[in-house]
Amino acid sequence: MNMEPKYNPREVEAGRYEEWVKNDYFKPSEDKSKETYTIVIPPPNVTGKLHLGHAWDTTLQDIITRMKRMQGYDTLYLPGMDHAGIATQAKVDAKLKEQGISRHDIGREKFLEHAWSWKEEYASFIRQQWAKLGLGLDYSRERFTLDDGLSKAVRKVFVDLYNKGIIYRGERIINWDPEARTALSDIEVIHEDVQGHFYHFKYPYADGDGYIEIATTRPETMLGDTAIVVNPNDDRYKDVIGKKVILPIVGRELPILADEYVDIDFGSGAMKVTPAHDPNDFEIGQRHSLENIIVMDENGKMNDKADKYAGLDRFECRKQLVEDLKAQDLVIKIEEHVHSVGHSERSGAVVEPYLSTQWFVKMKPLAQRSLDNQKTDDRIDFYPPRFENTFNRWMEEIRDWTISRQLWWGHQIPAWYHKETGEIYVGEEAPKDIDNWVQDEDVLDTWFSSALWPFSTLGWPNIDADDFKRYYPTNALVTGYDIIFFWVARMIFQGLEFTDRRPFNDVLLHGLVRAEDGRKMSKSLGNGVDPMDVIEEYGADSLRYFLATGSSPGHDLRYSTEKVESVWNFINKIWNGARFSLMNIGDEFKFEDIDLTGNLSLADKWILTRLNETIETVTNLSEKYEFGEVGRALYNFIWDEFCDWYIEMSKIPMNGEDEAQKQTTRSVLSYTLDQIMRMLHPFMPFVTEKIWQSLPHEGETIVKASWPTVREELVFEESKQTMQQLVEIIKSVRQSRVEVNTPLSKAIPIYIQAKDENIKATLIENEDYIHKFCNPSDLTIDTHIDIPEKAMTAVVIAGKVVLPLEGLIDMDKEIARLEKELDKLQKELDRVDKKLSNENFVNKAPEKVINEEKEKQQRYQEKYDGVKNRIEQLKA
């Protein structure tokens, strides 16, 4: 037995992970008789180091896989990383810029060499962080989204979907980043509320009779207007449908058309249509066969269709255009207006809705299959279930997916254009007469390859691959609720389309890690927390337990250093409890010496019963992914019952003369501590391995130890009830001692009036516990007691607990002291009451301050009532 006096996470964790990996503990057993359990890690981007969200995500996955391994499953936890197209390219671009060069200076091939070097560097950082977190990953199966095998899967999926008519090339409105000069996925667009303006302009009728009022937040796009639309049910405009207006500045005639898309109650009820620069306008344009006029180039500058504004930046054009409209008396008003504006997550540029020729996935048929699958036995279960509604809603409202990106880093689209005829060839391999063809320069959206992650990582498209046959479909996906649509949904429809099976059985969704004040963590706010710093200070086990138990499924988690520290204190409590137990168990006691059939004491039977109840609770809650509740159950059992009560109670036989009883106590201590370590292991892998190795045990590592199961022969319901009665009596005596300022070191007479003869006999049989915890000078247990005139009485389940006060305290002095305390409490109550009844304070003070005052009021009132009650007792 080698345990330091104080828990030191650095010493406990040093070298442990390397030992696990070296011994292949995390590799699947591949025992065909075992049921499989698979989780593929959501691949982190190779753009940088892992943040707290990653730590939370992977901790939950590791808890599940460690638990399943202990439950006898052939478990695979597969690692991997994502190439993260635009994000990584932006990082490499920035690095090149520091050297005074751009990717255009060095060309595509050389740039990709730099990108691969970046990937290798940051992949190494990520693996180091996985190790620090203690993740039970099988590194022999690590994958990367640009691996040859995964690239082959990507090409096959693209070609198959193209041949089915689901992938097509066409013109549609996409999110365009004018700075990075690429299309963006919706998740790469960050919407921020911006103080802008609502511009109201006059569009004169072509016949010269008045004007129609049009409002817009983007005046520069009006240069591409091709129509005005009104709602056919709007009585104000029934007579003008079919008429024409003149587009200001440009002079082009625009028809006034009827379309039910228009909101009658918004603005003037008339809307300009710019099909090439707004997704909704594009749909209207398609319905009415309107011309698509693009007025900007890919850099966000006005093109030659913008007439005299050609060459101006879009925002400069806006200013100039408004001034020109003012000069022509065509501005009705300009209102201050806060509206949501999309910004590129990478470049920060304002995203432009832009008509562009891109590659798209036709989503309706794929989404419908996903929806239909949720009505079958192959359905996917969402945790919490409410997120299934979110999934269904998004699938019902889905639009076609832009999958091409104007980048160099990524899966180059497997499409070639004939140099002479312009014919398109799409194939998994390049055309044989390659000299006559040029490949599409664009790459695929990162989400395209990550949508194949659950099956491409296991060997697909080779459906005979051993891993694909054995470990697919996977069992659980653990990820954040913010990417249900962007990633979860896409994995589901690709899995169904290409494997005819759901890619995973369960989806466990967690929230975001927020700062302690509830704000989102971000670099700009400077409130981010590096998980490696937390591990350095408190250890991986403290961070893991906090992350896993700090919230319920689907909810956000507020990071708190204080709470991580409290977990450290919990582990230190476990450490001290284990250390005491091991000192009493002794080095001579072996695993085979554990015998729970001997003469078990009441405390032994109680702790074994509570252990079995905790095993059942923890196992059942874990199956539902309710790790917050699991944490509470473990904390209460280990801290309150095992450490604070049973360990103290075990000192009675261990300090006694009965060797047989000592041996039984050693068995119970050893067995209970062993089972606690096993339950805690998925949450705290490092410290549990350290303690378990010091315990009498079978096997080489707790990683491969079996999960605890309920043993009915070790459940003693009657003993549990008896112990509950004893604990209540002990707590009552201790509380009464506090109330009359009598320390535990001072022996006092204690009377217990039992409800009946059975309870009396049980209490007498177990009075050793009362002697140890209450220090009576004289202990009387009977069914009838003459209660002294001056005494403190507490009603408990077993009857009454009576403490005579005569000679214990000076009654007059104690009453005077308590009355003085009561007076002080009354003054505090008056002060708080006055504050909370002040309307000015209640209306102006922050909610947090008001709540603090209310909490004070409640505390003072409880103290006041308690002191008043004690005075009445003493006077009685």
From Swiss-Prot:
InterPro entries: aa-tRNA-synth_I_CS (IPR001412), aa-tRNA-synth_Ia (IPR002300), Anticodon_Ia_Val (IPR033705), M/V/L/I-tRNA-synth_anticd-bd (IPR013155), Rossmann-like_a/b/a_fold (IPR014729), tRNA-bd_arm (IPR010978), tRNAsynth_Ia_anticodon-bd (IPR009080), Val-tRNA_synth_C_sf (IPR037118). GO terms for molecular function: aminoacyl-tRNA deacylase activity; ATP binding; valine-tRNA ligase activity. The keyword RNA-binding does not apply. It catalyses: tRNA(Val) + L-valine + ATP = L-valyl-tRNA(Val) + AMP + diphosphate. A motif ('HIGH' region) lies at residues 44-54. GO terms for biological process: valyl-tRNA aminoacylation. SUPFAM superfamilies: Anticodon-binding domain of a subclass of class I aminoacyl-tRNA synthetases, Nucleotidylyl transferase, tRNA-binding arm, ValRS/IleRS/LeuRS editing domain. It is found in: Cytoplasm. The keyword Aminoacyl-tRNA synthetase applies. Its EC number is 6.1.1.9. A motif ('KMSKS' region) lies at residues 520-524. One of its GO terms (cellular component) is cytosol. Its main location: cytoplasm. Keywords: Aminoacyl-tRNA synthetase, ATP-binding, Coiled coil, Cytoplasm, Ligase, Nucleotide-binding, Protein biosynthesis. It holds the Pfam family Anticodon_1. Transmembrane segments: none annotated. Residues 805-876 form a coiled coil. Monomer. ValRS has two distinct active sites: one for aminoacylation and one for editing. The misactivated threonine is translocated from the active site to the editing site. The C-terminal coiled-coil domain is crucial for aminoacylation activity. Belongs to the class-I aminoacyl-tRNA synthetase family. ValS type 1 subfamily. Catalyzes the attachment of valine to tRNA(Val). As ValRS can inadvertently accommodate and process structurally similar amino acids such as threonine, to avoid such errors, it has a 'posttransfer' editing activity that hydrolyzes mischarged Thr-tRNA(Val) in a tRNA-dependent manner. This is Valine--tRNA ligase. The lineage of its organism: Bacteria, Bacillati, Bacillota, Bacilli, Bacillales. The gene is valS.
